From Swiss-Prot:
Protein purpose: Part of the gene cluster that mediates the biosynthesis of clavilactone A, a meroterpenoid that features a unique benzo-fused ten-membered carbocyclic ring unit with an alpha,beta-epoxy-gamma-lactone moiety, forming an intriguing 10/5/3 tricyclic nested skeleton. ClaR, ClaS and ClaT are sufficient to produce clavilactone A and the function of claY, if any, has still to be identified. The biosynthesis begins with the prenyltransferase claS that transfers geranyl pyrophosphate (GPP) to hydroquinone to produces geranylhydroquinon.
Gene3D superfamilies per record: 3.90.1200.10
Protein name per Swiss-Prot or TrEMBL: Clavilactone A biosynthesis cluster protein Y
Any single Pfam family the record assigns to this protein: APH
Source domain of life: Eukaryota
Organism name: Ampulloclitocybe clavipes
SUPFAM superfamilies xref list: Protein kinase-like (PK-like) (SSF56112)
InterPro entries assigned: AGP_Transferase, Aminoglycoside_PTrfase, Kinase-like_dom_sf
Length: 404
């Protein structure tokens, strides 16, 4: 399916959207020994045999849509085992267990449309890998559907995302007031906190953080160790200088965030992009997927504009990696962001205040966790220079200044 995408010059192209399937299989067709072993393990916990599969995702996890002989359609998500790396295996297992627990907790404690988990299997005698079997939710991924929605439906999708389904409910759920990734509480049916699981095991935290200041110091430390800043002495020296300047600015900014409502810890989906949201033709949000990366963070970091509307920081066309594309044009993104800000301002003033107050800090975090190559932090430095010129407009969501 071709969808409109914009390049850094603002030119529109029609590119392949998120695949509806990477590979289809039906009974009678050839299977690898590894896939045959895995499907046999799945069939041990399904009510009937598997007649066909579709590979929905194949990168960090294997996600299959399976059709059974009795007509049921389910989703199976396999956690790939690590290849002889105990540290990576612990990371993979930890995010699998955390995702399972959080999805079950959200189904019991919220109205957020997460898939219902039918079965959980761990690697062992009966299974070659950890996997879960879930219900299949209706709808299409927003990445493929957004351009097909009417202007009214796009605004309705923002309203539905905030008010009825995800964002504002996450903002108000009762969660522990420490910074990290969730684990089951013991005893009880609540949540506890473990060190934050990163999108790569090398980016995970080694402890739980009590304050926003501690967490920001951790992120700066990770960036200084990141391969993205370059390997040479010159690149590292330039990067360290830029990061020190930015950290000094952040420390000053943190002193202005005095309201307890801005520092209250909030549950957030760390990967809430347009391929992890399902919508119908009217803009109703029908599913929120892929909770393996989530965290509890201060409100100023946990809130934000929808990721697919971003032309900021690492998505600013002047400084973005060459691999970045945009699924919404700049002018439309400005209008939809304005609508989003208006919606949350009416529905939850504290959310809106965190949205405004945290705009600069969230941009900094996006740069610190970005793993695209940036030797010497030259892209980051260019953004810092441009942001200084914007002045007070950094914190005004209704006055978004487009890039020149």
């Amino acid at each position: 399916m071709l969808i409109p995408c914009w390049d850094s010059a603002g030119q529109i192209h029609h590119l392949e959207g998120f695949p509806t399937s990477f590979k289809d299989w039906s009974r009678g067709e050839e299977l690898s020994a590894q896939r045959r072993e895995f499907l046999s393990a799945v069939e041990k916990v399904t009510p009937s045999s598997i007649s066909s599969t579709r590979d929905l995702a194949v990168d960090m996890n294997l996600t299959l849509e399976v059709t059974l002989d009795d007509g049921q359609v389910l989703v199976v998500r396999q956690c790939y085992p690590s290849q002889n790396d105990d540290v990576e295996e612990l990371w993979r297992t930890s995010k699998f267990e955390s995702e399972v627990n959080l999805m079950q907790w959200l189904e019991q404690n919220s109205r957020i449309p997460v898939p219902s988990i039918h079965s959980v299997m761990r690697r062992g005698t009966d299974s070659p890998a950890h996997f879960i079997i879930m219900s299949k939710l209706p709808g299409q991924v927003l990445m493929n559907s957004h351009s097909l929605l009417s202007s009214l439906a796009k605004v309705f999708a923002l309203s539905h995302l905030t008010v009825r389904n995800t964002v504002l409910e996450l903002f108000r759920l009762d969660v522990p007031q420490r910074i990290g990734t969730t684990i089951p509480s013991n005893p009880g049916d609540g949540l506890d906190v473990r060190p934050k699981i990163g999108k790569q095991y090398s980016l995970s935290a080694d402890r739980v953080f009590d304050t926003l200041e501690e967490y920001m110091r951790h992120l700066f430390s990770l960036k200084r160790k990141s391969k993205s800043i370059g390997d040479g002495d010159t690149d590292k020296a330039r990067a360290y200088s830029t990061l020190t300047t930015l950290e000094d600015l952040v420390n000053v900014h943190l002193k202005s965030l005095t309201s307890p409502s801005l520092r209250r810890c909030v549950l957030m989906h760390d990967d809430l992009h347009d391929a992890n949201i399902l919508v119908d033709i009217h803009g109703n949000i029908t599913g929120v997927l892929d909770w393996e990366f989530h965290s509890i963070q201060p409100a100023v970091l946990a809130v934000g504009y929808p990721a697919w509307l971003s032309y900021d920081d690492t998505n600013d066309p002047r400084f973005a990696s060459s691999s970045v594309w945009w699924v919404v044009g700049r002018q439309e993104s400005i209008e939809l962001r304005r609508q989003y800000a208006m919606i949350v301002k009416v529905k939850d003033l504290e959310y809106y205040e965190a949205l405004v107050a945290g705009l600069f800090l969230r941009s900094v975090v996006n740069w610190l966790i970005d793993e695209h190559a940036d030797p010497g932090c030259l892209r980051l430095r260019g953004w810092m220079i441009s942001e200084e010129a914007l002045g007070e407009s950094l914190t005004q969501p209704d006055q978004i200044v487009p890039a020149k």
